[in-house]
Structure formats: structure tokens, C-alpha cells
Regions:
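Periplasmic/extracellular, small/polar-rich flexible segments of pilin-like filament-forming proteins
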Residues: 42-128
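N-terminal single-pass transmembrane signal-anchor helix
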Residues: 1-17, 21
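A generic "functional-site adjacency" signal
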Residues: 11, 30, 97-99
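Generic detector of isolated residues embedded in canonical secondary-structure elements
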Residues: 16, 35, 102-104
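Generic signature of intrinsically disordered, low-complexity, basic-rich segments
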Residues: 7, 19-23, 64-67, 71
Length: 128
């Protein structure tokens, strides 16, 4: 009986801890997205347009590997590893136009977060 109770408590504790870690990583990703947004404001004030990933994507971008994050860091943070050295587990990219943008973050579990230029972070699916 005691062993069963300890087993149940262990299972509950593991699930609770996993949920806590997942929430902490998402919060970290959201904070980094806000930093990217600030860097975009500086980019716009210097060049008159916002930076976008890849081939000047306007409707979406792929954030499922580190290449997009590395390109973003090179363009907006002078290569400083703001995204790739974080413990968030998310990669990021940016899509939009010269006058508007959306920051997209994605992790290996398929959680997709999006932050439009003048909005709040939106979990694009139920995997977050």
C-alpha cells in the first residue's frame, strides 16, 4: 500500500515538474521574442524597414532549425547568441514586409508561438 502511494506521488510530481519546465521554457522564448521585437525597432529606425528571414518571406517562415535563429542573430544582434545559447529550446525566424513583421518561434515538440509587430504572443497551436 505504501509503495503504491509513493508511486502515485512520484508520478504526480514528475508530471508537475515537466509542466513547470515547459512553462519556463515558453516564458523564456516569449522574453527573447520581446528582445527581437526591440531589435526590430532599432533596425527600422536605422534602415527604414524591418528585417525578415530567408527570401524576404511575407506570409510565413521556417523556424524548425537553428539556421534561421543564427541568421536572425547575425542580422539584429551582431552575431550575439541571444536565441541559440538560451535554454528555451525554441528557434526563431521573422516574416512580414518592410513595414510590418511577425516573429515566429518553434520548438522540437511542435509548439509554435507568434508575436506580431504591435501585438501579444499567440500560441499558434495546442502543443504549447
Amino acid at each position: 500500500m505504501v509503495v503504491a502511494i509513493i508511486g502515485i506521488l512520484s508520478a504526480i510530481g514528475t508530471l508537475t515538474y515537466s509542466g513547470y519546465v515547459k512553462a519556463a521554457k515558453r516564458s523564456s522564448a516569449e522574453n527573447i521574442m520581446q528582445q527581437v521585437s526591440l531589435a526590430q525597432t532599432e533596425e527600422y529606425s536605422l534602415t527604414g524597414e524591418y528585417w525578415r528571414s530567408g527570401a524576404q518571406d511575407t506570409t510565413t517562415c521556417s523556424a524548425n532549425d537553428k539556421d534561421a535563429s543564427i541568421a536572425l542573430e547575425a542580422a539584429l544582434f551582431s552575431g550575439k547568441e541571444v536565441i541559440t545559447k538560451s535554454d528555451s529550446g525554441f528557434n526563431m525566424c521573422i516574416f512580414g514586409s518592410a513595414s510590418d513583421y511577425t516573429i515566429k518561434a518553434e520548438n522540437a515538440d511542435g509548439c509554435v508561438l507568434q508575436l506580431p509587430r504591435n501585438g501579444i504572443v499567440d500560441a499558434g497551436n495546442d502543443k504549447c
